[in-house]
Amino acid sequence: MLELEFEDVPNNIGSTFDPESGYTNFQRNYLPGVTLDQIRIFYIKGREIKNSLSKRSEWEVTLNLGGWKVPVLNTNFPGNRNNAVPDYGLTFHRISGYLARYLLGKYLAETEPEKLIMRTKIVNPLAEKNGITWESGPEVYLSFFPGAEMFLGTFRFYPLAIGIYKVQRKEMDPKFLEKTMRQRYLGIDAQTWTTTKLGEVEAALKVVSGLGWKKTNVSSAAREFLSKFGIRM
């Protein structure tokens, strides 16, 4: 006779992942020696990288970005999405957020000539396609990178504000805000900051709402070129 056996499983006690600790580990092990050109490749080729990962079943993959090699746990493949990711494990999403945080810190600490170089080399496709450029401010521009929501304090709630704005405009399903709504804000848990930081979120949303969003297929370099002829896009 067929016997079906079932065993009890422990209750889900929640994730132990701490983005701050994860970033520190990433910074120590993978950021020394990394260049802006290598980071540029990661973001410019982001969609291509994700598409490639989604078609490969391997759980552990190494990305070679212009000589910068970083290991990735392939959660982009449908069959891997329920795999447990260690606290210090690197997914595409985590790497994106870590690099965004690194770029913001680097930008704010640099001289004006170095900032100009960064603005030239680092392009955020998700911001650019909405007509948002570095001119909107580094915190805003870099907040469009996936994973920036892990650092709501560093990015002054802009990742959340961008998500709220997209939902209000019917450009994004509200369910995609769930991950952001679980994040901490400068060490404050979500249950607390959602009641004590409403003013800060509203201020961030006001900034984001006033950015003059517009869909465009023209790059920032092309817009700058055309502006020399009095053409604004």
Swiss-Prot record:
GO BP: symbiont-mediated suppression of host gene expression
A GO CC term assigned to this protein in UniProt: ribonucleoprotein complex
UniProt-annotated binding residues for RNA: 15, 18, 47, 50, 75, 81, 94, 123, 125, 128, 166, 182-184, 217
Keyword list, A-Z: Capsid protein, Eukaryotic host gene expression shutoff by virus, Eukaryotic host translation shutoff by virus, Helical capsid protein, Host gene expression shutoff by virus, Host-virus interaction, Ribonucleoprotein, RNA-binding, Viral nucleoprotein, Virion
Subcellular localization(s) per the UniProt record: Virion
Highest taxon above the source species: Viruses
Ranges in coiled-coil conformation: none
GO MF term list: RNA binding
InterPro entries xref list: Bunya_nucleocap, Bunya_nucleocap_C, Bunya_nucleocap_N
Role summary: Encapsidates the genome protecting it from nucleases. The encapsidated genomic RNA is termed the nucleocapsid (NC) and serves as template for transcription and replication. The NC have a helical organization. Seems to participate in the nuclear relocalization of host PABP1, thereby inhibiting host cellular translation.
Subunit structure: Homotetramer. Binds the viral genomic RNA. Interacts with host PABP1.
Domain comment quoted from the record: The N-terminus and C-terminus are involved in homooligomerization and play an essential role in viral RNA synthesis.
UniProt protein name: Nucleoprotein
Species in which this protein is naturally found: Bunyavirus germiston
Protein encoded by which gene: N
